[in-house]
Amino acid sequence: PEAASEAASSEEAKELSTTDALRIAGLKGPTTMGLVNLLSMEEDGTASMDYDLQLYGAADEIVPLLMKGELDMAAIPANLAATLYQKTEGGIQAVAVNTLGVLYVVEKGGDTIQSMADLAGRTILSTGKGTTPEYVLRYLLNANGIDPDKDVTIEYYSEATEVTAQMANTEDAIAVLPQPYVTAAGLQDDTLRVALDLTEEWNKVADTQLITGVTVVRKEYAEEHPD
């Protein structure tokens, strides 16, 4: 009986811990790099609370979970955070900027891309359709007199790893990639080079800082946990 009681208490504690854990989601890539430290803190016992951190390949996997209240917090692209704020009428709010400029144009096997203008007539591989990478790329192309719908061909992939795989099989490939994928791809293929830093290109044409990722929280959770 005593053993059974201890087992029951242990199970209850486990359920309570799971229930009380802060449910966080992040995307594989730069928007979540700042959250990785939470895992090591939890493992070594220095975290101030329990965390349940889940990583996803695409932002559209996270959105419905936030909307249904199955997540408390998430690291997502900045433009998506703005959309969710509007859709939920403030029910999901940004609490911190976690990622600034981390996007680059990478070229394989050449040095033909020296400026945004050089992208005209080329095919560009990219992640992030409907999120920050797409909007940044389209904004910069337009700002440099290039129609993103007519003057270039943009092929979108759901994850950065798919872009790097496609680059490996494409001669003279050009891609928009975030860190740390730029570095990882370069280590696997020494013919890749960083052609353009999109933060630098942004600063040439915009008077605002390029913010690519933010951390959002459900308003209800924030009100229940003000600390």
Predicted ranges, named:
Residues 13-30, 49-55, 93, 121-126, ...:
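Short, well-ordered beta-strand elements
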Residues 15, 108-124, 219-226:
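Flexible hinge/capping segments at coil-to-helix
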Residues 21-22, 26-61, 65-67, 84-87, ...:
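Short, polar/charged alpha-helical segment
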Residues 53-65, 77-79, 148-169, 180:
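Short helix-initiation/N-cap motifs at beta->coil->alpha
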